[in-house]
Amino acid sequence: MNVKGKVILSMLVVSTVIIVFWEFINSTEGSFLWIYHSKNPEVDDSSAQKGWWFLSWFNNGIHNYQQGEEDIDKEKGREETKGRKMTQQSFGYGTGLIQT
């Protein structure tokens, strides 16, 4: 292989490594490249699965990251609400206070 071929091949390898590393750094919740966490509407609300946005991109030509982030925010809100309810229930009974 001549020098020009080696230079082009090495630039291709280096740029691929940089892109993969950049995607890994900027991924959300451990998602990597085109694997994106999405909810499966057919299953219970508490379960999440990895969805392939790559396939849906071919169906409609777009990938809406904002919708995925909104789903994550909604799930966090449900967890916080559930946590508050459990805390209120645990402090509501057996506190040792005399109520008249």
Curated annotation (Swiss-Prot):
Name of this protein: Inactive N-acetyllactosaminide alpha-1,3-galactosyltransferase
Membrane topology: Single-pass type II membrane protein
Record topological domains on the Lumenal side: 28-100
Record-level GO cellular component terms: Golgi cisterna; Golgi cisterna membrane
Coiled coil: none
Membership in a protein family: Belongs to the glycosyltransferase 6 family.
Subcellular location as annotated: Golgi apparatus, Golgi stack membrane
Alphabetical UniProt keywords: Golgi apparatus, Membrane, Signal-anchor, Transmembrane, Transmembrane helix
Domain of life according to the entry: Eukaryota
GO biological-process terms attached to the record: leukotriene D4 biosynthetic process
Residues passing through the membrane, by range: 7-27
Disulphide connectivity of cysteines: none
Keyword Ribonucleoprotein: no
Cytoplasmic topological segments: 1-6
Gene: GGTA1
Organism: Homo sapiens (Human)
